[in-house]
Structure formats: C-alpha cells, structure tokens
Amino acid sequence: MNLLHWSSPELTLTFALDDGPVRLIGVREASRPDSEDLVPSQPLVEVSATGHGLSPSTNRHVDTTLGQQLRYVRHEETGATLRIIQDDPSTGLRVTSVFEARAGVRAWSEASIAGPGTLELTFLSSLVVGLPSVDAELHSAANSWMAENRWSVRSLRSETLADIVSDAHHHVARSRHPVTNAGSWSTGEHLPVGVLIDRSTPYALGWQIEHNGPWHYEIGESRDGGYLLLSGPTDQEHQWSVELTADTPFSTVPVSLVAGTDRDSVFAALTRQRRAIRHRRPVDDRAPVVFNDYMNTLLGDPTTEKLLPLIDAAAEVGADYFCIDAGWYADGDWWNTVGAWQPSATRFPNGLAEVIDRIHSHGMVPGLWLEPEVIGVRSPIAHELPDDAFLTRRGVRVAESGRYLLDLRSTAARAHLDQTVDRLVREFGIGFFKFDNNTMTGPGTDKGGTSLGHGLLEHQRALLRWLDDLQTRHPDLLIENCASGAMRMDYAMLARLHLQSTSDQEDPLLYAPITAAAPAAVLPEQAGHWAYPISGSTREEFTFALVNGIPGRLYLSGHLNRMTPTELDLIRSALAAHRAILDDLDTLVPAWPLGLPTWTDDWIALSLNGPDISYLTVWHRTPGPSTVTLSLPRSRIDPHFPTEDTAWTYTWTDDTLTITANTPEPSARVLRLTRS
C-alpha cells in the first residue's frame, strides 16, 4: 500500500494512494505512533450528481458512484498546505482535497469539470474520514433559543448503528447517525461540533464545520470499519445543488479536524485550532468589559432619561464599553419597521448625541445594537431598495415574521449597510456593534436561477465578505455576533468577529450550564456571558449572577444606578476577578471535572487550565448544603470570587477535591488553583 503521511503541528494524517479512490485512513496526534490497524475502506471524497447517485441506494451520503470512480492524479505540498487531486475520466470531474496545517487541520473540497459538458452536483463532502470502528461514544449538542450548548453523550452501537452481523454475502448496514442544521441559523438546532471517543482504545476524534448556514455530518458503518462525513448544504437535506462547468468551479465549506486521547484533550485541541484559524486584529487585544442595557434592565426601551444614570453607574464600576441595545431607532413598536437605523427623536429629545457624549465623557467606548440583515415590511427602506436587494423565491420577496431579508450578493443591499454603519461610526464615534439576527431565511433563494440552497450559500458567503470589508474600513471597530442569542455560533462568523453572545437566557440558574458548556463550542475569550445581578436579591443570588460571566467575557447588565454601595462593591470585585482571568484567557483550555453539564445537573464545574494555574468555576444549583468530589491534580486553592468566603469548604485527598456548599440557597464560586 502506498501511504502518504502529512502533519500539522498537532495532527498527522495518513492517506492511502492505491489503485482506487484516495482514502484518509489515519488521523492521530502528531506525537503518537502510527496505528497498526489502518483500515483503507472509506474514500476521501463522496460526490453525487444528477444521473450519478449511490450504490446501494440509501439515505447516506457514502457509496457514491462518482466517489468510487475518482482516481489519484497527484498531490502538491506548498508550505502549510496539501492538495490531493483526483479525476474521474468518464465525466471529466476533478476534485481537489485541500488541507491546511494550523494547530489541527482545516480541510475542504474543490470541484471542477474539464471540457464543454456540465455536471449538476447534488452533494460534495468537505471531508470523509475512515474509522476503524463505530463502537464509540458521540458527544454532540442540541442548541436552541435560551437553551444553548446542551451536550449529551450516546453510544453509537447501542442507539443508532445497530450491529446486524453482516457477512461476506450481504451488504453492510445502511443505517447512519445524521446531524443536520437547516436555514440561515447555523446553530438553530444543533452545534456543528462533535467528538467521537473509541470505547476500546485511548483515542478520540473531534471536528467542527465552519459555515454560517446549513451543514450536515453523519457517522455510519462500512464493511471493515466506519466513516465520519462532514459537509455543508446538501440536496437531500437543504435543497442545494450547483451546476459545474469549465468556467464555474465549486468549493465546499471548510471543516476542522483534531485528535486526542479523551474528551477533554480533544476539546483542548479544538480550542487551539479555533485560535489558529481566527483572523485576530490588534483591536481584539483590548478584551473590554461591555455594559449592555438590555438584559433584565431596559429590555429594548432606552431613553435619555433611563440611559444617563446607567451610563454614570457603569463607568463608576469600571465598564470599558457601553452598548445601547434594541429600540434606539424607533418611537414605539419597531419589529416590522426596522431598516433606516435613524435615532428616535422621541426617545432622545436632545438627540442621541447627548447620550453618546455622556459615554465618551467617562472614557468609555459607545456601542449600538443593529440587525443589519433585515428590513421591516413596513419600513420606508423596503420601498426604496429594489427587489434585487432581497432574497426572493420565484420573484417574490421572502418575508418572515414581518421582515424582508437582504441578499448580500446585491450591490444595493451592501451599499445600504455600508452607508448605515459608516454614518453611525462617523456621527457618533461608535466603536462597538452588537449585530443581531432574529429572522431565519428558510431554505434560501432561487434568484439568479440557482437552487434554493445554493442561493443561500452564496448569500452567506457574501455576508462574510461584507464583514471582512467592514472591518478593513474600520479597524478599531469591535463586533459582537448575536442571533437571538447563539443561533449562529459558528467559526465562519467567529473567525472574524470579536465576541459571541452565548444566550438570551434571563434566569441565572439556567445560564450556569450555558456558561459552563460554552467553551466546547466557542473560545472562552470570545464567549460573551451575561452577568445581570438584580438589586435587592440575596448576596448568594447576586454572586451567582456575576459568577456566570467571569469564566469567559463578562457581559454586564442590570440597574446599576439603583444598587446599594455593597452591591456595587461586589460588582467591582467580580470585574477585578474577571480581568485577572482575562490576562491569561487566550492561553487557557477548557476541561469539565464533572463532565459536560446537562440542563438539569445540580452541580456543574468548568476548569480553564494553563500550564501552572487553573480557574475552576463551580455552581451548586439546588437549595441546601451539599457535597461534591472532583478528580483534579492536587493544587493550592485560593478563592478568586468572591474573595472572602466561609460558606464553601475545600478538602484534598490525594488528587480528589471535596467541595461542600454550606448555603441554604443555590450558590457559585470561582477558584484559582496553583499547581506546585
């Protein structure tokens, strides 16, 4: 067997270059030896087209006839990039598999066709990995509004990939475990992230799909092992197809791949990979504490009268940025009238500039909430912009929840958004935008004669280009990625943007598992967690709400101007604790001593680990005293927040930490662990 070994700093890939299709038969940590159980069973590329389907016919995206017909032509190594080129002589199809060495590996497929013919693709994988076995546990996450990052673990063999005891005279099992997300909310139902842990060896594989629209992955069984298939939109799941000609090639969405020995080592590797693919700008180094007036505070009803005392109070506790959230652009009900983004004269009788100037006067940077991709059906802008500026189906504008949706392929749509952002930056010195997205597109647009799914793919890619151009024009601008909380929490967006809203959840007790699980999907230095203490609540309730924000990017809200001096001192202490973690945050990797949290866990723990120091955040969500044990390297414990605490006790027995919460109500703590 002719083998090709190729490595990134942390990962080694092994390909079989034999007489059949190229196969990716090994994915391992670069520091680990070659496996002796390489199984060259699954082609590297799976591709379907009209007239070229599957054999046997199933719902799976493997066993494609075109994938089986591809043959190795050559490979090219240039710097940190590997390109493996395969052709199908019968159709003229050429597929190039591209691999970029980052921390792990980033990969995608490029398809083209030679000659005068055409080929209508209905599926093209970004990457397919051959697995030695499907006797494995899958860690994956459901994601929905106010209930984000809900991780679970399942045994593939016992739950979805039943062992049918196939022999040589029968086909292999045709079942699969599919995970799919549809529409423009890339994380509206599921996260595009997974970890597969082998049940018999210390081996684990992790991945993420980096697209801000539809995606699909599936795991299934082959005759002598299994496969992991990663892709963007498909015809079967998303109404996607595209016509290849000699002049119109196609590239899939990128994916990332890492490996480790267990769950936490893989999530640590994914964390390093996310840092490696991020387009970090000098302004990202600021990592400011942002106060936002929305959550459990003004709730979309800002006025000069309400904002000025909040601004003064936010400055007093030490916020760096002050973001005015929804409502600043409308006198009353605004949902289906948005689009002009002009300040309301009713809310701000002396102009929005009076409020913005107060923010500037305290040395804070002003921010505004904006929902750039929608135009309300009752907005004057809906009549000023041409139909070409909007997503359409059969010539009719797509309308969802009282909004039209801009098509960012359109010059008119981009010009409208450019003029809006440039005006707000120029007139008010805006340095921060919270870009929200509360309306889904459905399957897409057929404008230009494309399939619905391909029209959506082109729009989502145009959105990314618009964001890139915007940040090039405004290099000091920070942008928060929000879509009804975290409904678009993907690394097409987050490779570019500064901050991710992790939820719209209003209950601190329910925010705890969201905060704790977030680093499995997003970098801790990008995870914007609401901390919204409520004046008049008990000290433990107040503390709990603040703890939620500390192990990430604390996103402050609450009626600070109504709080007592004691409450404000506790907020200052929380911000000091948070800033101490910020000094190290972009080097720390996550681990979960009690496992990834479920939605109903009483005890939850997140550890952010460095070489010598860890920050351990622990939540106890039920009333009354309780005790929990954690397996951790024995370390010195210092209370990090709150710094003065006698209600929780800590006892080491070898490498087991016993924590007792002696409180009559739910409580939470952040600890600093120093290894000797």
Question: Language-model features: where?
Answer:
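Active-site-adjacent "subsite" loops/lids of carbohydrate-active enzymes
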Residues: 288, 299-301, 345, 372-423, ...
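Polysaccharide-binding surfaces and accessory modules of carbohydrate-active proteins
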Residues: 2-221, 238, 642-650, 659
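Hydrophobic faces of well-ordered beta-strands that scaffold small-molecule active sites
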Residues: 289-293, 324, 366-370, 433-435, ...
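Active-site groove signature of glycoside hydrolases
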Residues: 320-328, 416-449
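Aromatic- and glycine-enriched glycan-recognition loops and surfaces
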Residues: 293, 297-383, 415-419, 458-471
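Short Pro-Gly-centered flexible turn/kink motifs
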Residues: 242-261, 616, 665-673
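Active-site-proximal substrate-binding groove within the catalytic cores of carbohydrate-active enzymes
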Residues: 463-673
